[in-house]
């Protein structure tokens, strides 16, 4: 099949993704992408918004069991809120959990005082992101003991689906909002390219619950779309050809052109990042992050690079431009990297040049 690369190469693409912090910079940010072809602002904005709200993984409380409470329409002596209000408050607890599977957390407080999310006893791989959240108020002598069930998932799961078949008496299932993204809004404005205004500018505002940064949220959503759309591409566009292992092409050996392209790709991976002629700032950031070979670099995602100390968008764009000139990009998957004899292979490559 003759591939007409002009179908995508001649479309206007954003030069960079600009971030504008708004409100709480850790949880809320606006991203600006321009210029885009007319109509692409709406297409990308709507697709990203839907994925952000529905498909990102997170953790949430799925059930609660309170001592001396049989059902959610009960009340507790010395507790100002009834159980229904307590459950509503607990649903707002933002939990960050590293592992998978269901966990049990506990709260134990004696009045007088305020029970907050910070009173939840957590293990090392679990963190409560909004410890100041008020759960209930206790009067003098009141006792509040509760067990919380935490699980991981995506999207929204109704309380009825969180009730196990062997649920004990007193277990109250809770609506679980696993999504770490709380709000997404986008708008499309006109963008100027030269004297032309017939282009789109996409402004995407993302607010999270603090368990994930807005940058990571948009990166994950874009990766999900990329993964879903890959099925529809039935041809090789001539960019970095896939490799089954370092030094081995997964394309048919009958094509000498494909073999040469794959060999050149693998040669580039074995080069050291010092050979990229980057700015001093970018080079130092890579050195401090222990990135030695180009093969190490291309496996990093943009989000991972931006988490590197002193590494900003300017350095990111510089590296992306250099890698693009070599037919490489960030976020590549390279099976078998690093090879066991990487130093020997790199030394042999240097001798050839």
Swiss-Prot record:
Residues 248-263 have a biased composition (Low complexity). Residues 244-263 are annotated as: Disordered. InterPro entries: DNA-dir_RNA_pol_insert (IPR011262), DNA-dir_RNA_pol_RpoA/D/Rpb3 (IPR011263), DNA-dir_RpoA (IPR011773), RBP11-like (IPR036603), RNAP_asu_C (IPR011260), RNApol_insert_sf (IPR036643). Residues 260-353 are annotated as: Alpha C-terminal domain (alpha-CTD). Keywords: DNA-directed RNA polymerase, Nucleotidyltransferase, Transcription, Transferase. It catalyses: RNA(n) + a ribonucleoside 5'-triphosphate = RNA(n+1) + diphosphate. DNA-dependent RNA polymerase catalyzes the transcription of DNA into RNA using the four ribonucleoside triphosphates as substrates. The N-terminal domain is essential for RNAP assembly and basal transcription, whereas the C-terminal domain is involved in interaction with transcriptional regulators and with upstream promoter elements. This is DNA-directed RNA polymerase subunit alpha. It comes from Zymomonas mobilis subsp. mobilis (strain ATCC 31821 / ZM4 / CP4).
């Amino acid at each position: 099949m003759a591939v007409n690369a002009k179908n995508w190469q001649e479309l206007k693409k954003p030069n960079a993704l600009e971030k504008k912090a708004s409100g709480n910079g850790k949880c809320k940010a606006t991203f600006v992408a321009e210029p885009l072809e007319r109509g692409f602002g709406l297409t990308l904005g709507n697709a990203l918004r839907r994925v952000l709200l529905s498909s990102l993984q997170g953790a949430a409380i799925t059930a609660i069991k309170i001592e001396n409470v049989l059902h959610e329409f009960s009340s507790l002596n010395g507790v100002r809120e009834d159980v229904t209000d307590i459950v509503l408050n607990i649903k707002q607890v933002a939990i960050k959990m590293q592992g998978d599977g269901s966990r049990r957390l506990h709260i134990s407080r004696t009045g007088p005082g305020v029970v907050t999310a910070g009173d939840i006893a957590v293990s090392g791989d679990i963190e409560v992101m909004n410890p100041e959240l008020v759960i209930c108020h206790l009067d003098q002598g009141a006792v509040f003991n509760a067990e919380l069930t935490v699980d991981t998932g995506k999207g929204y799961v109704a309380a009825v689906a969180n009730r196990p078949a062997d649920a004990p008496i007193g277990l109250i299932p809770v609506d679980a909002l696993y999504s770490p993204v709380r709000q997404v809004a986008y708008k499309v404005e006109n963008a100027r390219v030269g004297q032309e205004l017939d282009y789109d500018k996409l402004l995407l505002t993302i607010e999270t619950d603090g368990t994930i940064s807005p940058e990571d949220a948009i990166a994950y959503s874009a990766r999900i779309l990329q993964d879903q759309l890959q099925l529809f591409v039935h041809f090789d566009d001539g960019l970095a050809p896939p490799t089954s292992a370092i030094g081995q092409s997964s394309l048919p050996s009958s094509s000498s052109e494909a073999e040469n392209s794959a060999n050149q790709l693998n040669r580039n991976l074995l080069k050291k990042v010092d050979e990229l002629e980057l700015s001093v700032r970018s080079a130092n950031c890579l050195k401090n992050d222990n990135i030695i070979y180009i093969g190490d670099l291309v496996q990093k995602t943009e989000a991972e690079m931006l988490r590197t100390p002193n590494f900003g968008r300017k350095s990111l764009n510089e590296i992306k431009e250099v890698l693009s000139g070599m037919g490489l990009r960030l976020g590549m998957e390279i099976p078998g990297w690093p090879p066991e004899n990487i130093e020997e292979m790199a030394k042999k490559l240097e001798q050839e040049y």
